Amino acid sequence: MLNYDKMEKIGEGTYGTVFKARNKNSGEIVALKRVRLDDDDEGVPSSALREICILRELKHRNVVRLYDVVHSENKLTLVFEYCDQDLKKFFDSLNGYMDAQTARSLMLQLLRGLSFCHAHHVLHRDLKPQNLLINTNGTLKLADFGLARAFGVPVRCFSAEVVTLWYRPPDVLFGAKLYNTSIDMWSAGCIFAEISNAGRPLFPGADVDDQLKRIFKQLGSPSEDNWPSITQLPDYKPYPIYHPTLTWSQIVPNLNSRGRDLLQKLLVCNPAGRIDADAALRHAYFADTSDV
């Protein structure tokens, strides 16, 4: 790491320690993500290196740039563009109120980043407010894109914090192993509701069972009628027939009817029925975004 001066530790990410650093040559501030691998004896898997090389090609204003990959001994250090805060910290600064224009701008940027990455056949698989970063001029950027495929999604973070289930779709909670872009669209829906409610999570489940119950109590329990092949999923088990008791206008009171319509198109239990990022960007909710 001869080219970088470490300034301070920013935190513990899902995959390892993150430092704020300065590029000695250019003076630019960057984020260094040091990836810890489960089996250090093995070194860095070639599959991980292949995936990471793909990520270097992702260049979009709503995706955090991966500038460089430094591979030494058993360590892999990823050099990313630096952002001041994540969406979770941004929520903390709001005092419980998010104005409609800011909410729409954040969601628009999230979907633009997703659309770009999905067009390049890269999934995120672990979207949450902690890996949506915001820089000083209010641009939202998706971080950690593709790392789940390169390194797997661990059950626990490097810091022993449990990886959250709050943004996982029902198909994944039921053990689905074949992912497509729909996994990210569900997460985007959960984040959309959280943005609208100024940081209050939509489905804050304690474990897989509680997570599924919370989802089905709001959306209604799925069945073979509205989700063919649900019973074939590896960890499927039947749940009671839940009927929603709260309306969407009660759950996201700050979201207008167009926003609620988009939210319901994102939060479809059957992955085949979920709206994709491009269609979401064409939704009427974004029709009046000349101000964004």
UniProtKB/Swiss-Prot annotation:
UniProt keyword Zinc-finger present: no
Transmembrane segments: none
SUPFAM superfamilies the UniProt entry points to: Protein kinase-like (PK-like)
Keyword Kinase: yes
Result of altering residue 144 to N: Loss of activity. Decrease in glr-1 synaptic localization. Loss of polarized trafficking of dense-core vesicles in DB motor neurons
Annotated Mg(2+) binding sites: 131, 144
PROSITE patterns assigned to the protein according to its UniProt record, in alphabetical order: PROTEIN_KINASE_ATP (PS00107), PROTEIN_KINASE_DOM (PS50011), PROTEIN_KINASE_ST (PS00108)
Gene disruption phenotype: Several glr-1-dependent behaviors are affected including an absence of backward locomotion after nose-touching stimuli and a reduction in reverse locomotion. In L4 mutants, incomplete elimination of ventral rab-3-positive synaptic vesicles associated with a delay in the formation of dorsal rab-3-positive synaptic vesicles in DD motor neurons. Normal formation of ventral synapses in DD motor neurons at the L1 stage. In addition, mutants have an increase in anterograde dense-core vesicle trafficking and in the number of plus-end-out microtubules in DB motor neuron dendrites.
Cofactor needs: Mg(2+)
Any one Gene Ontology BP term: regulation of cell cycle phase transition
Cross-referenced PANTHER family: CELL DIVISION PROTEIN KINASE, CYCLIN-DEPENDENT KINASE 5
Its biological purpose: Proline-directed serine/threonine-protein kinase which, in several motor neurons, promotes the polarized trafficking of synaptic vesicles and dense-core vesicles (DCV). In the ventral nerve cord, phosphorylates lin-10 and thereby prevents lin-10-mediated anterograde trafficking of the glutamate receptor glr-1. Involved in the inhibition of glr-1 trafficking in hypoxic conditions. In DA motor neurons but not in DB motor neurons, regulates axonal transport of synaptic vesicle precursors by inhibiting dynein-mediated retrograde transport.
Protein name: Cyclin-dependent-like kinase 5
Organism in which the protein naturally occurs: Caenorhabditis elegans
